[in-house]
């Protein structure tokens, strides 16, 4: 939950996608494919279902729609923070910090979708230009063609470009 945006299956998918792209091995089994709202893995819903009850609510029946709000259980925040500090390896904590930096400025659902979609295209076509990326976004879905303004795509492309050397094989 950030800047008025709710936690959701959609947001969890985008964060898991970027953690995987940043090299998080515990997410290596998630298979992301190009779907209506960008890269998506059905496995993320299973992870959320496993966390349901103690860390969040809204995934009781695993029927939450992509943008349906999930409620984070803030009473567990201290436990989660302690887990991150004591149980994650330093490189995993570094990935979390990089995820925060990478998504800074892209926290709305639309901007997360744009960032992840542009990255997915760049991953699939490593030498793709900005112009070709804009064109591919336009053929992904009619919704993306209408919603993703050229400037939004360029902003995401340039943002990802800044991280290309720091993130390694992410881009």
Model-derived features with residue positions:
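Domain-edge interaction signal
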Residues: 1-171
């Amino acid at each position: 939950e950030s800047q008025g945006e709710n936690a959701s299956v959609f947001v969890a998918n985008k964060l898991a996608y970027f953690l995987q792209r940043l090299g998080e091995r515990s997410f290596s089994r998630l298979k992301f494919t190009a779907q209506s709202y960008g890269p998506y893995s059905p496995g993320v819903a299973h992870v959320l279902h496993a966390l349901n009850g103690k860390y969040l609510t809204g995934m009781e029946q695993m029927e939450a729609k992509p943008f349906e709000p999930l409620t984070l259980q803030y009473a567990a925040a201290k436990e989660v923070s302690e887990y991150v500090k004591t149980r994650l390896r330093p490189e995993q904590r570094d990935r979390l910090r990089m995820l925060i930096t990478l998504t800074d400025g892209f926290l709305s659902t639309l901007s997360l979708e744009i960032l992840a979609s542009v990255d997915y295209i760049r991953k699939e076509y490593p030498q793709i230009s900005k112009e070709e990326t804009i064109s591919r976004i336009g053929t992904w879905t009619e919704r993306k063609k209408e919603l993703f303004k050229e400037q939004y795509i360029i902003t995401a492309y340039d943002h990802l470009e800044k991280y290309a050397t720091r993130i390694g094989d992410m881009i």
